Amino acid sequence: SAASDVYKRQIQKPYGSTVDYNKDLIDRFNHGELMNADSIHFPDSLKVQTKKLGRTVYGGGGIMPDYFVPIDTTLYTDYHRNLVGKGVIIKFTMQFIEGHRKELANKYKKFESFNEKFVIDDNMLATLREMGEKEGVKFNEEQYQKALPLIKTQLKALIARDLWDMTEYFRVMNTTNESVQKALEILNSDEYGKKLK
């Protein structure tokens, strides 16, 4: 899921209610802040220099990340959104697990083995598409192909969540989360280590 991308600047920012939080998020999306770093503006009055490293930070709640990873909204197509909205993704996952629970438990005793070897195959995807049609989700080849990597990841993550827990769900989902992958790359780089000295 792209939660880490979306909520970056909400950290430490005070909100009176969930409604205020959601409104701010929608406003930021509409202003392009989640897609382009140039759309994020802070008044100069909020700039503060850190004492130790002399880095510029901003007061007033929220943070500005050192590196910006835009949200790619093209991966989440209308076709995929309709599969999710009509409950097809969840229904398919539950039916698959109930029909294969014993087999999955015997084959994948540890999550690491599941994560490395389990694949969402063509038969599973054909069943998903059929279920979608039955629920009134009209198949769209172009949108399906565009969303396919995300659909596969989501299905695998939901199966992992049922067999294990939320930690394993996120371990699968984060393999295709661009913000998480970029963060891991940066945190393991010499360049970022130098910034913190």
Feature locations, PLM:
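Conserved functional hotspot residues or short segments at active or partner-binding sites
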Residues: Q10-K197
